[in-house]
C-alpha cells in the first residue's frame, strides 16, 4: 500500500542524486487491516538504517555493506530501482525468503547511491499466506539467512549473529 507521496519523494531523491541505484523508504506494517507504525522489528530496522540518513553515506559501499552484514533492513516493496544504473539481473531467484537481501548485497558492491527516506511511504502487509511465512515454517528462511551472513562474516561470527537475528522471524506471526 503506497502513500500518495511515495512517487514524488522517490523521484525527487532520484533526480537530486549523482548515480542512484535504488530508492527505499521507511514503512509501516499492515496487520489484520490495521496500520502498525512501530514494533520491535521496525525499530531495529530503523536503527540499522540510521547511517543512511546521512546523504554522504548513501554512496559509501563500506557503510552499505556494514548495514547489510547485520541483516536486511530494507523492505523490498519500498524499493524503486533506477534500472539504467543496475545490472540486467537484480534478483538471482535461487533464494525463497532472502532473494531481496541477496539483491541488496550484490548491489551494495556497485558504485552509486542507496537513497533512503525516513518517511513512512508504504505499508507492508503481514499475512499468514506470505512466502516469508511459508519459508519460516519449513526452516528454509533460517538456512538462507545463515548463508547471507556467511557472505559478510566468517562462519563462527555468522552463526553468532544469526542466533540473535533469527528471533525476528517471530514478528511475521499475526
Q: Which residues are covered by each model-predicted region?
A:
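Conserved protein kinase catalytic core
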Residues: 3, 32, 131-133
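Conserved nucleotide-sugar donor-binding catalytic segment
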Residues: 25, 43-141
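Conserved donor NDP-sugar-binding/catalytic core segment of glycosyltransferases
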Residues: 5-44
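Alpha-helix C-cap/termination motif
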Residues: 16-17, 110, 151-152
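C-terminal, non-catalytic tails of nucleotide-sugar-dependent glycosyltransferases
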Residues: 50-62, 113-114, 137-174
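Alpha-helical elements of Rossmann-like donor-binding domains used by nucleotide-donor carbohydrate transfer enzymes
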Residues: 1, 5, 9-13, 102-106, ...
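Short, solvent-exposed polar/charged micro-motifs at secondary-structure junctions
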Residues: 32-35, 126, 168-173
Amino acid at each position: 500500500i503506497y502513500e500518495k507521496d511515495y512517487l514524488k519523494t522517490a523521484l525527487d531523491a532520484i533526480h537530486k542524486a549523482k548515480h542512484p541505484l535504488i530508492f527505499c523508504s521507511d514503512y509501516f506494517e499492515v496487520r489484520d487491516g490495521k496500520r502498525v507504525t512501530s514494533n520491535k522489528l521496525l525499530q531495529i530496522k530503523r536503527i540499522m538504517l540510521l547511517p543512511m540518513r546521512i546523504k554522504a553515506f548513501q554512496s559509501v559501499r563500506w557503510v552499505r555493506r556494514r548495514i547489510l552484514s547485520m541483516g536486511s533492513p530494507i523492505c523490498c516493496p519500498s524499493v524503486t530501482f533506477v534500472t539504467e544504473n543496475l545490472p540486467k539481473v537484480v534478483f538471482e531467484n535461487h533464494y525463497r525468503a532472502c532473494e531481496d537481501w541477496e539483491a541488496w548485497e550484490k548491489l551494495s558492491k556497485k558504485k552509486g547511491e542507496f537513497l533512503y527516506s525516513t518517511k513512512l511511504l508504504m505499508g507492508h502487509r503481514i499475512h499468514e499466506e506470505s512466502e516469508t511465512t511459508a519459508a519460516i515454517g519449513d526452516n528454509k528462511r533460517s538456512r538462507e539467512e545463515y548463508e547471507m551472513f556467511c557472505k559478510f562474516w566468517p562462519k563462527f561470527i555468522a552463526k553468532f549473529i544469526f542466533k540473535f537475528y533469527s528471533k525476528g522471524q517471530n514478528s511475521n506471526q499475526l
